[in-house]
Amino acid sequence: MSVTELKERHMAATQTVSDLREKLKQKRLQLLDTDVSGYARSQGKTPVTFGPTDLVCCRILQGHTGKVYSLDWTPEKNRIVSASQDGRLIVWNALTSQKTHAIKLPCAWVMTCAFSPSGQSVACGGLDSVCSIYNLNSPIDKDGNHPVSRMLSGHKGYVSSCQYVPDEDTHLITSSGDQTCVLWDITTGLRTSVFGGEFQSGHTADVQSVSISSSNPRLFVSGSCDTTARLWDNRVASRAQRTFYGHEGDVNTVKFFPDGNRFGTGSEDGTCRLFDIRTGHQLQVYYQPHGDGDIPHVTSMAFSISGRLLFVGYSNGDCYVWDTLLAKVVLNLGGVQNSHEGRISCLGLSADGSALCTGSWDTNLKIWAFGGTEV
């Protein structure tokens, strides 16, 4: 068979796949006679309401000299780790705004960070394609820096996201620009499983984000520049359990819903979407029209403890609080006093749900508390 014939067969197969996907999309739309907000309205549900003092900025964490790219809370709610383009990880006391650790990184181009479940270690990764682990209790070296306690090497592209397996300091999942996700054994520094890559059901572009289910830690979801999200079982690396379609741009962020049966996605197309992992169906789209201007990209997201609220960061500095049930914006933190002056790059909710932390390219982190005292 000639090269020309192979190319023709490949093009025909690609077109067939595209046609089948479109037919599947149309069939799903026929079966979905309503969405979450439509059903909620039919049941007489009313939107969540916010007063001017219900969610206020009570702390401003200043110390980074470069864009803040990532943050994470400890399970005990009073500490935050942040990663910045200044090449440092900073661990903050969220109650006092004091820095407890400042770790200078070998590679300044850090993109992600995470606290271990015990709060004793932090992980980070970036353009060096390595996920580095730092033990916060280890003695500092003669230059005043914390030494790396473990380097997880194996990715062939940048490390875009990392998350510890819930209740385990010994296992962690990373996503990468090499189109794969990896489950690591931190004790040995070895890869336990690789998800994607040479496998047909893997992503076909950079993987940007991962989220592990807290109710079933064997399951995690990944979001990619191929516009899809995929559900994985960490015991079955050879294939994704489901692939979720709907976005028209890179999927920048994914986050499990508190009950573990659904998850949210945020994309370059300016929308967030809610999917059900049991049916594979899209339940809701969260989108706020912005006129004829450029559509701001979704950069980060987090659900409230109950799941009724969805906090979403955008590239234009907005931070919307969505009512997930009625798909309504109930508050925009980008339009209140003490809002950020740049892109919202990351955000996260404390373990008890009492506070939200946002990080921005303006180099600051801000803690927003429900019913707190404004700074």
From Swiss-Prot:
A Pfam cross-reference name: WD40_Gbeta
Domain of life (superkingdom): Eukaryota
WD repeats: 63-93, 105-135, 154-185, 202-233, 246-276, 293-323, 339-369
SUPFAM superfamilies per the UniProt record, alphabetical: WD40 repeat-like
GO cellular component, one term: cytoplasm
Single GO term (MF): signaling receptor complex adaptor activity
InterPro entries noted in UniProt: G-protein_beta_WD-40_rep, Gprotein_B, Guanine_nucleotide-bd_bsu, WD40/YVTN_repeat-like_dom_sf, WD40_repeat_CS, WD40_repeat_dom_sf, WD40_rpt
Biological process according to GO: G protein-coupled receptor signaling pathway
Coiled coil: none
Keywords of this entry: Repeat, Transducer, WD repeat
Disulfide bonds listed in the record: none
Family: Belongs to the WD repeat G protein beta family.
PANTHER family: GUANINE NUCLEOTIDE-BINDING PROTEIN BETA G PROTEIN BETA
UniProt subunit comment: G proteins are composed of 3 units, alpha, beta and gamma.
Function as written in the Swiss-Prot or TrEMBL entry: Guanine nucleotide-binding proteins (G proteins) are involved as a modulator or transducer in various transmembrane signaling systems. The beta and gamma chains are required for the GTPase activity, for replacement of GDP by GTP, and for G protein-effector interaction.
Name this protein carries in UniProt: Guanine nucleotide-binding protein subunit beta
Organism: Nicotiana tabacum (Common tobacco)
